[in-house]
């Protein structure tokens, strides 16, 4: 009897534990498809046909993306009245019942992208009207027209962000966004919009970001969204962009007009805060210097704007598009892939704050460097892929490129640069002059030479760390061509014979170089001075496309990480040299497109097992006049290689001895045939009687 209370307590404890375990197992079974973190439930991609009902009722974020729900019923979300964020992206939704959001008074973010809501858009619109506190709504990819979108957005005055991207909207008027006074972000990209009526966005007083990319807009005229900060109209068919005239102050900071068909530089607001202007891939050019126009009528264009019963005429100067634009705060200007043949006087002077200028792939022939042109704040200048044959530097101009850090002049027609141009560029770190037919100035360089520039001098550019001279047709390098620089990256590729069989011209920068490219330079193994032992910090070496027959020499403490030996004349690799580099940290080596002998690759096991050869599947070798992939070679030494590994002396003896014996027998027969007396003597002396 004394033990009865103890047994009762133990029994009650085990029953409680068992009940808890069973209930926990049931809960885990119902929640196993979802990940629960705090108040967030992630059920994406679980092939759910309905909203799970056993999740914690206090959940505030529910993600059901990529589940075949098809229909959101009135009761689907009732267990979760505290939801603040709901994502139903790619759920094949065709219908949302009218009362689906009736109990979701706390919902702030709703994602319905990539569904089929155009099927029952009226019922969906009625369901959305029950969300008075909704701030973010994503309706992208639902095949909605402008009328459907207008109905769904009706009475949702609390919205801050709306996405209608990827729908079938064609025209916009003031009825589509009526009542959205608090809207700040509007995404309309990837529609079919070809017309925007005047006043379509007038009711959006708080709008700050507008995305109209990937549509069919032919022009934007009388642009007057003064409070807009970011406008993206890229990938349309724009031929004109004209802002509203007058003295209205615009808050526009970023304007993207890239990938259009603009013919003229856009007419920007007279007062703005523009910081980023993207004009890439258009048909723009400046034309004043190309056409001798003396008549004022030939220098203007008039736009007739008809809005109902009101007709406005806008007169624009064709040749001075930028003169009235406010570019004082501009930081980033991308004018690449256009038709600019020159830059007008004073164009860059209007941008004193400009730090990045991209003029890649235009038709520039000359560039005049004057005071404040380019501006002193410029840090990156890209003039690559033009037709530049000469750079003009104003006399007596000092520190014109004092802030420049990156200067790209590749793929032009330059023969040299003005004396002193780089001497004033005290902060330049990256310089690309590849694919220009330049030559390097001898030592000492004439700093006071006159006439057109005929060479380039890189000496004493203390800040220079990266230099590319690929394909410049350079002759043999002069003495100390890079003296006084801090080069860590040097590309001399495709300059045949530039080293003249020696690495001595690189001795000034050899201890600092980390990346060296000597591709397609005609290097061959007979260069006795081709020794990289002095390049103590070298990590990446490209020797592809040369005529090397032996492995380069790497002495000292050189620890390469990447080595490229493709397209050479290597027949084998010395195992000692390769093993040394592997032990020092060689991570990647390229060996393909060399005439290797298959009988000399059996020692490459360390390379193969270490996965060091990046192009191992492409490495081939020669076996009995057949090209075979190394990966397809049989295990062990191939049969055709065994004869090659025999002692050559023994092989020659085996081949010569039968020939000698045959020759001796033939000589004996001939002598005995033509010497009959001798034969008789031999017979008489060797005769003996037969015994029967």
Curated annotation (Swiss-Prot):
Work out whether the entry's keyword set contains Cell membrane: yes
Q: Which GO terms describe its molecular function?
A: receptor ligand inhibitor activity; transforming growth factor beta binding
- Extracellular-side stretches of the chain, per the record, are 19-650
Give the signal sequence positions: 1-18
**Domain LRRCT residue range list:** 595-643
Output the SUPFAM superfamilies linked to this UniProt entry: L domain-like, RNI-like
Organs and tissues of expression? Mainly expressed in cells of hematopoietic origin. Highly expressed in bone marrow, thymus, liver, lung, intestine and spleen. In the brain, highly expressed in microglia.
Q: Which InterPro entries match?
A: Dev_Immune_Receptor, Leu-rich_rpt, Leu-rich_rpt_typical-subtyp, LRR_dom_sf
Q: Name one GO biological process term.
A: sequestering of TGFbeta in extracellular matrix
What clinical condition does the entry mention? Answer: Seizures, early-onset, with neurodegeneration and brain calcification: An autosomal recessive neurodegenerative disorder clinically characterized by refractory seizures apparent in the first year of life, mild early developmental delay, and developmental regression after seizure onset. Other features include hypotonia, hyperreflexia, peripheral spasticity, poor eye contact, absent speech, poor head control, and inability to walk. Brain imaging shows reduced white matter volume with delayed myelination, and punctate calcifications.
Family named by the database record: Belongs to the LRRC32/LRRC33 family.
Subunit structure comment from the entry:
Interacts with TGFB1; associates via disulfide bonds with the Latency-associated peptide chain (LAP) regulatory chain of TGFB1, leading to regulate activation of TGF-beta-1. Interacts (via LRR repeats) with TLR2, TLR3, TLR4, TLR9 and probably other Toll-like receptors. Interacts with CYBB/NOX2; the interaction is direct.
Fetch the PANTHER family from UniProt.
Answer: SLIT RELATED LEUCINE-RICH REPEAT NEURONAL PROTEIN, TIR DOMAIN-CONTAINING PROTEIN
Its protein name is Transforming growth factor beta activator LRRC33
Q: Which organism is it from?
A: Homo sapiens
């Amino acid at each position: 009897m004394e033990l009865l209370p103890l047994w009762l307590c133990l029994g009650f404890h085990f029953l409680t534990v068992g009940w808890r375990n069973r209930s926990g197992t049931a809960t885990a079974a119902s929640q196993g498809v979802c990940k629960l973190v705090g108040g967030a439930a992630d059920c994406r991609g679980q092939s759910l046909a309905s909203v799970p009902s056993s999740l914690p009722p206090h959940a505030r974020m529910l993600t059901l993306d990529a589940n075949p729900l098809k229909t959101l019923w009135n009761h689907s979300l009732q267990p979760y009245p505290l939801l603040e964020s709901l994502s139903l992206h790619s759920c094949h939704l065709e219908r949302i019942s009218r009362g689906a959001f009736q109990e979701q008074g706390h919902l702030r973010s709703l994602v319905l992208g990539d569904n089929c809501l155009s099927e029952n858009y009226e019922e969906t619109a009625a369901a959305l009207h029950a969300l008075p506190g909704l701030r973010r709504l994503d309706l992208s990819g639902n095949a909605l027209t402008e009328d459907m979108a207008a109905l769904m957005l009706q009475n949702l005055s609390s919205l801050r962000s709306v996405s209608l991207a990827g729908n079938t909207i064609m025209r916009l008027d003031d009825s589509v966004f009526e009542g959205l006074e608090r809207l700040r972000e509007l995404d309309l990209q990837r529609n079919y919009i070809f017309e925007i009526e005047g006043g379509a966005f007038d009711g959006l007083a708080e709008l700050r970001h507008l995305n109209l990319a990937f549509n069919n807009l032919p022009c934007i005229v009388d642009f007057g969204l003064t409070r807009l900060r970011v406008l993206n109209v890229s990938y349309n068919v724009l031929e004109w962009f004209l802002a509203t005239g007058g003295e209205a102050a615009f808050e526009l900071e970023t304007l993207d007009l890239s990938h259009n068909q603009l013919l003229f530089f856009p007419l920007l607001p007279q007062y703005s805060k523009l910081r980023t202007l993207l004009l890439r891939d258009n048909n723009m050019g400046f034309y004043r210097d190309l056409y001798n126009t003396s008549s004022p009528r030939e220098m203007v264009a008039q736009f007739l704007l008809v809005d109902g019963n009101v007709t406005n005429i806008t007169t624009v100067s064709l040749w001075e598009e930028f003169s009235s634009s406010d570019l004082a705060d501009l930081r980033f200007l991308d004018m690449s892939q256009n038709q600019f043949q020159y830059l007008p006087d004073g164009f860059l002077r209007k941008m004193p704050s400009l730090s990045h200028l991209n003029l890649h792939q235009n038709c520039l022939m000359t560039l005049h460097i004057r005071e404040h042109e380019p501006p002193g704040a410029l840090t990156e200048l890209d003039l690559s892929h033009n037709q530049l044959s000469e750079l003009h530097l104003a006399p007596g101009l000092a520190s014109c490129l004092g802030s420049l850090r990156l200067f790209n002049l590749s793929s032009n027609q330059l023969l040299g640069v003005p004396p002193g141009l780089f001497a004033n560029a005290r902060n330049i770190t990256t310089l690309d002059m590849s694919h220009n037919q330049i030559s390097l100035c001898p030592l000492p360089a004439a700093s006071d030479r006159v006439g057109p520039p005929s060479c380039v001098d890189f000496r004493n550019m203390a800040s220079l760390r990266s230099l590319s001279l690929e394909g410049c047709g350079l002759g043999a390098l002069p003495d100390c061509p890079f003296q006084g620089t801090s080069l860590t990256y040097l590309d001399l590729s495709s300059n045949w014979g530039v080293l003249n069989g020696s690495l001595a011209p690189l001795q000034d920068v050899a201890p600092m170089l980390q990346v060296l490219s000597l591709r397609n330079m005609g290097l061959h193994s007979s260069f006795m001075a081709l020794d990289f032992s002095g390049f103590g910090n070298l990590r990446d070496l490209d020797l592809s496309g040369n005529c090397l027959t032996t492995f380069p020499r790497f002495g000292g403490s050189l620890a390469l990480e990447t080595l490229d030996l493709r397209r050479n004349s290597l027949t084998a690799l010395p195992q000692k040299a390769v093993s040394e580099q592997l032990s020092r940290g060689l991570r990647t080596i390229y060996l393909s497109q060399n005439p290797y002998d298959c009988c000399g690759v059996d020692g490459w096991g360390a390379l193969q097992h270490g996965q060091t050869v990046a192009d191992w599947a492409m490495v081939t070798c020669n076996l009995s006049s057949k090209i075979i992939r190394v990966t397809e070679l049989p295990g062990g030494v191939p049969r055709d290689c065994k004869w090659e590994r025999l002692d050559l002396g023994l092989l020659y003896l085996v081949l010569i001895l039968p020939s000698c014996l045959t020759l001796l027998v033939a000589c004996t027969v001939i002598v005995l045939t033509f010497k009959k007396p001798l034969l008789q003597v031999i017979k008489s002396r060797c005769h003996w009687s037969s015994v029967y």
